[in-house]
Amino acid sequence: MLDIEFLYNFYYYIGVKKISKDSMENAISPVVEGEKIVVQGAREHNLKNVSVEFPRNKLVVISGLSGSGKSSLAFDTLFAEGQRRYMESLSSYARQFLGRMDKPDVDLISGLSPAISIEQKTTHKNPRSTVGTVTEIYDYYRLLFARIGRAHCPKCGREIKEQSVDQIIDTILSWDEGTKLTLLSPVIRGKKGEHVKIIDDAKKSGFVRARIDGLMVELEDSIKLDKQKKHTIEIVVDRIVLKEGIRQRLADSVETALKSSNGVIIVLRRVNKDDEAYASVTAALDAKGTPYDRNAAYIEQEVFFSQKNACPDCGISIPELQPRLFSFNNPFGACPECTGLGEKMEWDKDKIIPDPSLSFNERGIEFYNPESEWNKTMFTAVAKEAGFSLDTPLNKLTKKQFDYLWNGDEDIVLNWVYKKQSGEGYSEYRRPWPGVLNDMKRRYNEAWGDSQRVNMEEKYMSRHECASCHGKRLRPEALCVTIGGKNIWQLTELSVLQTIKFFDELDLSETETKIASQVLKEIRNRLNFLKNVGLEYLTLERSAATLSGGEAQRIRLSTQIGSALTGVMYVLDEPSIGLHQRDNQRLIDSLTYLRDIGNTVIVVEHDEQTLRTADWLIDIGPGAGVHGGQIMASGSPEFVASCKDSITGRYLAGLIRMKIPSERRKGNGSFVSIEGVSEHNLKDISVMIPLGAFTCITGVSGSGKSTLLNDVFFPAASNKIMKTDYPAGVYKKISGLENIDKVISIDQSPIGRTPRSNPVTYIGVFDKIRELYASLPDAKARGYKNGRFSFNVKGGRCENCQGAGTITIEMNFLPDVFIQCDVCRGKRFNRETLEVLYKGKSISDVLDMTIEEAASFFDSIPHIARKLQTLKDVGLGYIQLGQSALTLSGGEAQRVKLASELARPSTGKTLYILDEPTTGLHFVDIKQLMGVIQKLVDKGNTVVMIEHNVDVICQADYIIDLGPEGGDGGGRVVATGTPEEVSLNKKSWTGRYVAEMLEREKARGEVKE
């Protein structure tokens, strides 16, 4: 049963009229017809033994305050059980490869389908993943280019036609007389297996040698290949010296090689250093980035011939057009210099020597600690040889001295004597100085583990575009193949909208159309699915790691739409995140399409338009955390809107609204301006941000909001004011910063990386709580210090569970079992530590309190209560003090950071930057958050926020609207001014929706609270 008294008080607290007991007893509508999904006794997380039913094959939206239990029902109960049942239908052998699923805490779920979860997390951290690879469109591109692509010579650009045997022979005979050749027939190219039959057949055919994985071997020898590895086998058909009368033998050998390898032959051409061809051959090798020994008397050039692809003028052949040639994740297609990444980590002199005005002894070379006896001894010898002092600032060294310090000299042998650390004797060293750069490279290559290498990369390296492929990831042979005048990389650089237009206008021959029709159909479908979920501004070459959570989720949604599965239960987590109101209808159309083809679509959502479109609405509440977990209303949106005990229902009925300010702040008269911003799609724009006011940056998805605020403005302002060293995008000038003393960006990244991190450790209040316990008379009598009350270090924690409170037991084919520690009984600390009490509560009891409870408990300790109150003020009163940071959503993590900043003393001259802080928030939570933000501005601070929520935009003092479209169609300032001024701009999409909201409020008259 619902706690009626609590509900009364809760609604009174948030400013909603009290409700009647009768209305609460009639808030659940039964499913009257058709198949249904029934949940009975769900107790996962904060769900209070709830039971609910809803129709199958419908669009079902779950709403409620943040932390009320929406995700617990949707993901941790429905999805988890649907996936678990499917996995249990598999064999135990198959299950071992698929991970283990916990059984949710629920009595019964009936009517479930196999479940697919589409969450808002950005899961693609691999730098090789792009929008194209994630959506599989790039796979179809590779197939398309392999089938109808037109190859061109990488050197002269001429279209390459098929090569006949005579053309191949003529090309070889055009080389200098006396040239030594080895003719290879590549019978196996990069395939796994032992390939015993291939080798035996070659022997039987009379061949005696082969090149296997780059090494020449005798076929008579015992050859054993690892069947788990990929191998390349090239049979040596003949070894020839070019001379008069050799044509017939050469022709026979070429034909034999071509026949054995399906029209492909490799010729190893020995070019001596004094040959005329040496310069042109080495130039070609350099252009391709192919390594060779520059000091050798000759080089062996590998010339690839094909009966299909070769330039008759330059003699350049390219491999057979296969899909793998166009893959930057395959060695046959990837740029050999950067291995398909498009960029390389290179040593950054500015990071190694961040301040050249310092000397070595002042740690001018960041990597080398001058206090180290080894470094001191070694660099003393270096300085002596170069003729400078270790106290000399590095920027005062001569060019010759610095060159020796940086690059070394292998011809100069240094002597130095090193005193052993043990103090027992000395060691004498005689060796050349390799230079700082080479010494760091050696240490990097010899590093004992990945963590040490990663540390060196982060500290002393920077990413730079690959000089060979210029960021295009592919080898030249792949980039010289075109369709419609564009190579595959140029095609991926187009936005989704531009690509759709490209394929619509593509002119193909009848034969090409017949070959490519099915592939083009798949490409067009997937591109249109991306467009329909509001991602038409994305380019396919964009790294998947740079996508926001909402973008990543909508990409996965488009992939699922493309798969056209039926009979599935889809569970989505706020797919409208990061989406402008203009694009919302297309997203809803995609969700209803999934429903219409025969799927159950369950969406956790706060967006009003989505709530009204739902076939069935489940509202969970009434509050968050321990105050939530109950079904407040269940039925059609119209039914829920009639339920007086449902906050969401009252919101849909228009009974609660966020009051629009009657007056807008003018600011304090000062502005921060940034001019000439040209990063990404921004088109040399300039904007002015009023100080002492609340500004919203708006615009359709992909219009350039994040680029302007996060990639350019914040790093530029922070570098000037906070003396940071963030990489800033392209801009010409930033001014007005003298009027602010701090700039703080509050994003949605996690507040901790381990399960032991929690909100109170992040904001620093747990240190104060530990200090309080250590200052108690009982703790002092026992000699306890602050560390005694930490569960992260030895001393006060329970060592049986190492402060975790639980013991993990691994089960083979069953989920891991977490049992309460039988020593501390889940308290985390040992018995002696728990005997120290404050107001009758131990340190463990405090960690189990909610923020709301703790704020009341510590009300007599101002420096603790004040920080806890800030967490409560941003709507986090329901979370526990000891709750793991890993369980917090992105929105919750952002609000913890906001609370941390609010807890600091305000100067009234701080500029706060927020990126969609309303993500994951219910209307009531947004109302509370906006109260906090408005208080910040009332103190004289400046808040600049990226936002799509029209309710929030209408609260702003000033709007900067970018657009008018996304991608190349955006990047311009469309409108600026107050919401009322922007609403009059007919070119602004944001202005249209703001105008609608203002009109609605005007028609409603006095807002009902």
Question: Where in this protein do the model-derived segments appear?
Answer:
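Conserved phosphate-binding elements of NTP-dependent enzyme cores
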Residues: 2-1009
